[in-house]
């Protein structure tokens, strides 16, 4: 290869590397955002699960408070 061809090839590789570094940084930021969103969603699921459990326990009366069926 001639020196100018080598220099052109080196410039192409440097350009590709710079582009890849930018892409990696963009992907890293996306992963960070997704981690935050997942954490937020997990907290929402936990709160909703707790709320649902509390509602279910309040809807069920203890056996001692249940009225007997009408055929008794």
Swiss-Prot record:
InterPro entries: SlyX. Residues 54-66 have a biased composition (Polar residues). Pfam families: SlyX. Residues 53-72 are annotated as: Disordered. Belongs to the SlyX family. PANTHER family: PROTEIN SLYX. This is Protein SlyX. The lineage of its organism: Bacteria, Pseudomonadati, Pseudomonadota, Gammaproteobacteria, Enterobacterales.
């Amino acid at each position: 290869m001639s020196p100018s061809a080598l220099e052109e090839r080196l410039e192409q590789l440097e350009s590709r590397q710079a582009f890849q570094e930018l892409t990696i940084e963009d992907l890293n930021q996306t992963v960070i955002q997704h981690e935050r969103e997942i954490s937020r969603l997990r907290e929402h699921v936990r709160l909703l699960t707790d709320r649902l459990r509390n509602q279910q326990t309040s809807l069920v009366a203890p056996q001692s408070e249940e009225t007997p069926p009408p055929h008794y």
